[in-house]
Amino acid sequence: MIITVGIDPGKSGAIAVVADGAQVLVANNVPTAGKNYLPAQMAALLLPFAALWRERDAPLRLLHTYTDLLDAVKNPDMPEEEFEQVYTWSEVALAAYMQQDDRAVLAMVEKQRGRKGEGPERLVQIGKGWGLWEGICATLCIPYEEVSGPKWERAMGCSTAASVSLTQKAGEEDKAFGKREKAAKAKAQRDKKHSHVAQAQALFPDCLVKANDDGLADALLLAVYAFRTYQGREQ
């Protein structure tokens, strides 16, 4: 069994863990509280898979049931019904995974970069989430790699065009052109996100990826990209 992890590390991002490129084990938005990341909850989502690098009966294999997972990450201030919507595991798939002797794992983390015009606070937030996920993978002995957005998007056949190039019309004022350009860029970004969601829905029809869950869609697609990358190296 090959376990792959896809991580979109932004605050509106997500994490997905997939078995053999087809079975979703974990599908979650990045745990946050307001402007803050929740590192303990983030780590708990990957903790069951740290045991891959231990002996089968090692003490580290603590979180091996759905109930244990829920207890590990539960926010005591979060209502039960809200919690169930935020954290999603496949209990049956996880149970089957824990019985496997022959397993391998690879995590793929999307590289982050600031955009033109973004301030220092935004750049710090980008780096913080990215660093937390890589630190969690390293601590849990889960091998990980970084991949740029355009690279995995091309490999997965996704739309990569989130920018546009417009020409200012004759007699068009700068302000009007700026508004038109801004609107066109926003539409291109929305179209790109929608295409990613559609592809994730096609690959995982049983996983409830909503129209605005582009972070979760990217995480699922990254996990599949990691699986295909691993397969290519083993051949």
Question: Residue spans of the language-model regions?
Answer:
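Phosphate- and other anionic-substrate recognition elements at nucleic-acid/protein interfaces
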Residues: 1-235
